[in-house]
C-alpha cells in the first residue's frame, strides 16, 4: 500500500520543533505559528481562544495540504501586546479549561459509580 505508517501522523521527526514562529514583516504585530503533526482540532481551539482576547485584531488558521498534518496560525495583535504573549496566554487558558473538564468528568464518573454501587 502507498499509505504512510500511522505513527507518522503524530511522531515528530528527529530535531523538529513542535511549534515554530515566524514574524510577518509586512504587517505590524503579526506572526505565523506552525504546529507540526496537528490538525483542525487544535487549530480551531486555539483560533477561538485567541478571538476571545481583546488584544487580537486577527486570528486565523489553515492546513497547507490535506495530507500534511501541520497547522498554520496567523495572528495580528494591537500595540498592547505581541503575538507570542497572546498565544501563551491562550494556551494557558485552554490548559485550565481542559483540567477543569477532566476534573468534572472524573467527579461525575465517581457519582455514577456510587449510585450504581447502592443497587448492587
From Swiss-Prot:
Primary role: DNA-dependent RNA polymerase catalyzes the transcription of DNA into RNA using the four ribonucleoside triphosphates as substrates. Component of RNA polymerase II which synthesizes mRNA precursors and many functional non-coding RNAs. Pol II is the central component of the basal RNA polymerase II transcription machinery. It is composed of mobile elements that move relative to each other. RPB11 is part of the core element with the central large cleft.
CDD domains on file: RNAP_II_RPB11 (cd06926)
Listed name of the protein: DNA-directed RNA polymerase II subunit rpb11
Domain of life: Eukaryota
Similarity comment: Belongs to the archaeal Rpo11/eukaryotic RPB11/RPC19 RNA polymerase subunit family.
Any single biological process term in GO: transcription by RNA polymerase II
Keyword Nucleus tagged: yes
Record's keyword terms, sorted: DNA-directed RNA polymerase, Nucleus, Transcription
Major place of residence: nucleus
Gene Ontology molecular function terms on file: DNA-directed RNA polymerase activity; protein dimerization activity
Listed SUPFAM superfamilies: RBP11-like subunits of RNA polymerase (SSF55257)
The gene coding this protein: polr2j
Organism: Dictyostelium discoideum (Social amoeba)
